[in-house]
Regions:
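Short hydrophobic/aromatic-enriched beta-strand-loop microsegments
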Residues: 27, 67-74, 155-164
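Short beta-strand scaffold positions
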Residues: 50-51, 121, 138-139
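Domain-level recognition of soluble alpha/beta enzyme cores
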Residues: 154-180
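Short active-site segment of divalent metal-dependent hydrolases/proteases
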Residues: 12, 143-144
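Phosphate-handling substructures
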Residues: 63-122
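Generic beta-sheet signal
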Residues: 4, 46, 133-142
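Active-site-proximal alpha-helix that buttresses catalytic centers in soluble enzyme cores
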Residues: 2-67
């Protein structure tokens, strides 16, 4: 049986400002880096992957030191298109933003971006490879939520309920999972 460790990157300035941030390659905030330094994860022998985004690379380095790892863009966050790096307050009066929020939010595509369903399809197409051996994946909240929602549909949680706090995540073995404190 293999174990998949899903860990969300540490906080960025965009997280602190409640900005939509998916495709923008931001570093960790100073607060995010300091919070990660207080965490201690003991993970047995495993391969390491990141999404390749700066915030995931920095999180890996802080949590596990200089370990060999692979980057996989399949595990990048959703692309929010023209809404990227804006807050709800900045966007709330835009007609295209309201259209994106209305109806099936997972199917709606932000202008010049990708839908939640498109991101999920991208992530799930790469997931079987991760399940072949013990793997630590440092990635993004939406990616982790998509994986957890697909692995545990019987939990009947929505995507936002699966999304871990920065620096946190899940360890998944077969059909057993546990939150990483």
């Amino acid at each position: 049986m293999t174990t998949l460790y899903l860990i969300r990157h540490g906080k960025t300035q965009a997280n602190l400002e409640h900005r939509y941030c998916g495709s923008t390659d931001l570093p960790l905030s100073q607060e995010g880096a300091e919070e990660l330094k207080r965490l201690c994860y003991e993970i047995p022998e495993a391969r390491f992957l990141t999404s390749g985004m700066r915030r995931t690379e920095q999180t890996l380095s802080i949590l596990f030191g200089p370990v060999a790892h692979t980057q996989s863009p399949a595990f990048r966050e959703v692309d929010f298109g023209v809404f990227e790096m804006h807050t709800y307050e900045e966007l709330k009066d835009r007609r295209d933003y309201q259209a994106w929020l209305t109806g099936d939010n997972m199917a709606n595509i932000p202008p010049e971006g990708e839908s939640g369903n498109q991101m999920t399809q991208r992530v799930l197409s790469a997931l079987p490879e991760l399940l072949k051996e013990d793997t630590v994946l440092i990635t993004h909240g939406g990616v982790i939520a998509a994986i957890m929602e697909s692995l545990f549909p019987e939990e009947q949680k929505n995507r936002y309920q699966w999304q871990p706090a920065p620096g946190r995540g899940y360890a998944v073995s077969g059909k057993n999972y546990r939150p990483i404190p």
